[in-house]
Amino acid sequence: MSSVLELLARLKALGIQSAGVADDSRQVQPGDVFLAYPGDLADGRRYIPDAIARGAVAVLWQAGGDFAWNPALTAANFQVDGLRALAGPLAHTVYGAPSEGLSLIAITGTNGKTTVSQFIASAHAGRCAVIGTLGAGFPGVLEETGFTTPEATTLMR
């Protein structure tokens, strides 16, 4: 497995300064690096052409299964072992470590997580955002995310 700094150095050697990273082709913005790896429900490598069409300047992909890079695709690319595990740390670095300036509370359990998070956010003296089943944002002004827990690349953006 490469380190985040090694990945960034490889991108820089190719002349690529990443504006951001995305592991969902629908969220790729021009200048992003697309991270393509097998997921729980879908294989992100199937969406590489879509990510490039949306402006991805490079693709980092994980080998395995019957996947092979299509040489007709013109984006800079390289294979990375353990890419999914590196997605969060890579996003953290590319976006300037945004979570380091936050106080975080995690709520776990079988039932009541949404209720508890809303109670905490409402009772907190300062601005307090929540992420969960109902969406992400501030109490009363939540944006639907479609996910209970967004991927790290989405959270860091």
Residue ranges and their predicted role:
Residues 1-89, 93:
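N-terminal leader/targeting and accessory segments in enzymes
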